[in-house]
């Protein structure tokens, strides 16, 4: 018999902790959405004072299960147990009251409120007159930060914080509920290497305090560094759980994809043609200066550099999002002035942005609506009318080519996994038949199987004569996919490396100049 959230919260508050082997567990869980079985008889078991990683391709069911454990979704079938007692979680508030907190990949803080106000929202300490006691709230926040070894001013507005510090605030907020379980969804996707190290120190401190942590990630190195054990999901099913010390990287990949991935970077030697894009002394005041390079047909130019080096800003300028202050751009041997994305598209350029959710996908629209955006003004409009049948057929073919996992084209993009959202974006731009393709972090937050598929697509486009500019923070991707590598540091180009001479050390030396 399941215990109500209120009853379980009372048991938790009393300190009467059942003698259970697992802090949190799920057995026989099933969840269906229209046309899709997201979870089918899955299980999960989290031990106290441990880090348990969840691995699997996009759409494997990881996030769905975690949303069930966080009270966001309710399961169609199955049992959830907290410290051995079966519970029912009908809302995120139920989960919080029972000590289960989830830190989402998309952070949910109020930008114009202070750090302290965000942490204690709807739980603010009051003075005798019933007003918020900001002094007490400040001290409570400082005490919490001291416990977590976080150095952030409680009175600063969140909008002034870096992504890493916002994440620290989210963690502190979750801990402030006296949580026994923290669920972290891709917590390092937008962090630098140093910020990741800081996050891991905090995770280890939380683990030492007896907290159990569920860690969703696609990054193998993180699993081996921070996780005690891991579980793998595939196609909505539970595959297995192992100690992270008992397996190799290849073992995990086989469990995730159910097959061998023989070529993660299927780079081909293709004929390099004429110059398609030539940039000379391009500047954007206060951001980057004197950027010069060229890309030829069939060539993949990798762009490497640390966070803040200006790589994404250059991409946005090339695509007309932020017009340059000075410098020149030539397309196909002719000078052009690109002042808007519409003009860039007209010149057969395509740009896959690094932030698919904020500046890429229109989440509330369906797959068809997202894919057709870039082509409706062109070949599918005749006599002022859209040839909707032709549009749908073309988008259907593209979705099949990219292996987008969906029941149909009318599924809202917000319901897709991160990897499938990225495929929808790629499909949108492939429909424009581009001659120049700019990719900014094309495989960020995507599982190993989807990465290999996207690398294959990029290779095919290069083979077809497309000039590719690929910005990536993943060194194996840059080294494995690029014909040449351009390295940037603090808004300037510090050097170029050919494929046969490029090494991780050489790239990092140029990136740190």
UniProtKB/Swiss-Prot annotation:
Q: Which family does it belong to?
A: Belongs to the ABC transporter superfamily. Carbohydrate importer 2 (CUT2) (TC 3.A.1.2) family.
InterPro entries associated with the record: AAA+_ATPase, ABC_carbohydrate_import_ATPase, ABC_transporter-like_ATP-bd, ABC_transporter-like_CS, P-loop_NTPase
Q: What does this protein do?
A: Part of an ABC transporter complex involved in carbohydrate import. Could be involved in ribose, galactose and/or methyl galactoside import. Responsible for energy coupling to the transport system.
Give every ABC transporter domain span: 24-260, 270-510
What EC designation does it have?
A: 7.5.2.11, 7.5.2.7
- Catalytic activity reported: D-ribose(out) + ATP + H2O = D-ribose(in) + ADP + phosphate + H(+); D-galactose(out) + ATP + H2O = D-galactose(in) + ADP + phosphate + H(+)
Q: Which organism is it from?
A: Rhizobium johnstonii (strain DSM 114642 / LMG 32736 / 3841) (Rhizobium leguminosarum bv. viciae)
Q: Which domain of life is it from?
A: Bacteria
- State if Cell membrane is listed as a keyword: yes
Write one Gene Ontology MF term. ATP hydrolysis activity
**Protein name in the entry:** Putative ribose/galactose/methyl galactoside import ATP-binding protein
Membrane topology type? Peripheral membrane protein
Keywords on record: ATP-binding, Cell inner membrane, Cell membrane, Membrane, Nucleotide-binding, Repeat, Sugar transport, Translocase, Transport
Which residues participate in ATP binding?
Answer: 56-63
Q: Does the keyword S-adenosyl-L-methionine apply?
A: no
Where is this chain's protein located in or outside the cell?
A: Cell inner membrane
């Amino acid at each position: 018999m399941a215990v109500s959230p209120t009853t379980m919260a009372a048991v938790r508050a009393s300190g009467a902790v059942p003698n259970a082997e697992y802090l949190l567990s799920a057995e026989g869980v099933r969840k269906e959405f229209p046309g899709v079985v997201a979870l089918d008889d899955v299980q999960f078991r989290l031990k106290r004072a441990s880090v348990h990683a969840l691995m699997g391709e996009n759409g494997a069911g990881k996030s769905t299960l975690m949303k069930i454990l966080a009270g966001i979704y309710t399961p169609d079938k199955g049992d959830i147990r907290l410290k051995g007692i079966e519970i029912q979680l009908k809302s995120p508030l139920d989960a919080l009251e029972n000590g289960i907190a989830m830190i989402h990949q998309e952070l949910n803080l109020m930008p114009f409120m202070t750090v302290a106000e965000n942490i204690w929202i709807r739980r603010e300490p009051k003075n005798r007159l019933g007003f918020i006691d900001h002094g007490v709230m400040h001290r409570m926040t400082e005490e919490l930060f001291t416990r977590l070894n976080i150095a952030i001013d409680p009175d600063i507005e969140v909008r002034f914080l870096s992504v890493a510090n916002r994440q620290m605030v989210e963690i502190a907020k979750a801990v402030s509920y006296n949580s026994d379980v923290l669920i972290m969804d891709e917590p390092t996707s937008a962090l630098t290497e140093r910020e990741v190290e800081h996050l891991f120190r905090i995770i280890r401190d939380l683990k030492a305090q007896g907290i159990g942590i569920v860690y969703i990630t696609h990054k193998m190195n993180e699993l081996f560094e921070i996780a005690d054990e891991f579980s793998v999901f595939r196609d909505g099913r539970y595959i297995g759980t192992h100690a992270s010390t008992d397996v190799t990287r290849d073992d995990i990949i086989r469990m995730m994809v159910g097959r061998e991935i023989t070529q993660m970077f299927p780079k081909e030697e293709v004929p390099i043609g004429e110059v398609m894009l030539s940039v000379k002394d391009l500047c954007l005041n206060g951001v980057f200066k004197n950027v010069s390079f060229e890309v030829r047909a069939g060539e993949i130019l990798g762009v490497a550099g640390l966070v803040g080096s200006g790589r994404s800003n250059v991409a946005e300028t090339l695509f007309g999002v932020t017009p340059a202050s000075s410098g020149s751009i030539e397309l196909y041997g002719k000078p052009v002035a690109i002042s808007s994305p519409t003009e860039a598209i007209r010149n057969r350029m395509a740009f896959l942005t690094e932030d698919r959710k904020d500046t890429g996908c229109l989440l509330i629209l369906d797959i068809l609506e997202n894919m057709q955006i870039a082509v409706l003004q062109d070949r599918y409009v005749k006599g002022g009318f859209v040839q909707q049948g032709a549009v749908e057929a073309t988008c259907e073919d593209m979705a099949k080519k990219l292996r987008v996992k969906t029941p149909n084209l009318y599924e809202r993009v917000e319901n897709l996994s991160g990897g499938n959202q990225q495929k929808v974006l790629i499909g949108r731009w492939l429909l424009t038949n581009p001659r120049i393709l700019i990719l900014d972090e094309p495989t960020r937050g995507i599982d190993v199987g989807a990465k290999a598929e996207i690398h294959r697509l990029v290779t095919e486009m290069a083979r077809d004569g497309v000039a590719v500019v690929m910005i990536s923070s993943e060194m194996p991707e840059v080294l494995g996919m690029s014909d040449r590598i351009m390295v940037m540091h603090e808004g300037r180009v510090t050097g170029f490396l050919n494929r046969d001479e490029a090494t991780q050390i050489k790239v990092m030396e140029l990136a740190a100049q």
